[in-house]
């Protein structure tokens, strides 16, 4: 890059406070992989071969900022509403931001910028059984279930603020679009809000946290998910196996 372009890129893609976040967030609680959740809770970093700013999440962050600026003054709508979902003993409060909550419709929305292929695979990875979603036992199904748990937790956080929640939606937009138009290219996955799903996710998180801190400070007994890309590529470092609660 030229010096001028290098400076521009450096400034635009500088890490945000969210990028620097080391504590676990609501979006990570539904991860199938208990070992990765334990990593996050204990502050064990994940290393990747890539350096620099990942472009896909950056585009998602940029869209969220744009959506917030366009809609934050709408009546009867909460945009980027902070919610708290639980308080882990000796860890602290875990909170997140709901992209959009329509108070009149009692519906929480979560924007997702995904590839067209991922949206298509998501459609195929879910089936309904007596109005309940069943996710395929695949990598895509695992990721979709993670998103589903995330929005159930957002709904729970909203109820803790006194709001009534009836539905939660994942609104997926194709980030690799070309001639697609809105709204035809948008895919909404709408679910009835279920408190039991949120409470089960919170209880699981507490259980992982308890186990991560037990075993005389060792955490290597916590198992990986067979669907976890990070673990399947053996990206866990020796730091995990040798991690000790006392450092």
What are these regions (language model features)?
Residues 1, 138-145, 156-247:
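Metal-dependent nuclease catalytic regions and adjoining charged, substrate-binding loops involved
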Residues 128-148:
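A short acidic, glycine-rich active-site loop
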């Amino acid at each position: 890059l030229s010096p001028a372009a290098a400076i521009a890129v450096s400034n635009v893609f500088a890490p945000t406070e969210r990028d620097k976040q080391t504590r676990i967030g609501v979006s990570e609680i539904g991860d199938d992989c208990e070992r990765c959740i334990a990593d996050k809770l204990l502050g064990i970093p994940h290393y990747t071969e890539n350096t620099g700013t990942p472009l896909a999440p950056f585009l998602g962050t940029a869209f969220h900022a744009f959506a917030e600026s366009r809609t934050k003054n709408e009546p009867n709508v909460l945009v980027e509403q902070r919610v708290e979902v639980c308080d882990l003993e000796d860890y602290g409060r875990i909170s997140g931001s709901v992209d959009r909550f329509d108070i009149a419709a009692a519906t929480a929305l979560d924007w997702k910028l995904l590839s067209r292929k991922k949206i298509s695979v998501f459609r195929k990875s879910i089936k309904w059984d007596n109005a309940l979603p069943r996710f395929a036992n695949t990598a895509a199904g695992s990721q979709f279930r993670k998103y589903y748990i995330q929005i159930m937790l957002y709904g729970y956080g909203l109820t803790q603020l006194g709001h009534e929640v009836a539905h939660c939606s994942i609104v997926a937009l194709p980030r690799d679009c070309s001639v697609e138009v809105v709204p035809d290219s948008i895919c909404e996955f709408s679910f009835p809000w279920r408190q039991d799903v949120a409470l089960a996710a919170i209880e699981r998180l507490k259980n992982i946290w308890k186990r991560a801190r037990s075993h005389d400070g060792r955490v290597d007994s916590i198992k990986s998910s067979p669907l976890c890309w990070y673990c399947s590529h053996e990206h866990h470092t020796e730091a995990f196996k040798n991690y000790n609660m006392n450092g």
